[in-house]
Amino acid sequence: MSNIKSPIPGIFYRRPSPEEDPFVEVGSNVNPDTVIGLVEVMKSFHKVLAEVSGKVKSIEVEDEGMVRAGDILMEVEP
């Protein structure tokens, strides 16, 4: 099991905009280049990459939830 962690503190967004579908859902397959969400810091949005390959087992943060650097965002199983 691998954890995808927030690289920076801020607000985590699971979707690119309120009208669009989430980047990934539980059960989605990801690879290291897959964007799994965005973290907003001071009006700047930073992509969060999976950095691992596998299937999303759980999503630990709600859309628009506050995160700190190192917080677990998702769990991925190989």
Predicted regions and their residues:
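Short histidine-centered loop motifs in beta-beta connectors
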Residues: 14-29, 58-62
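Short hydrophobic beta/alpha edge segments that flank linear recognition/processing sites
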Residues: 25-47, 68-78
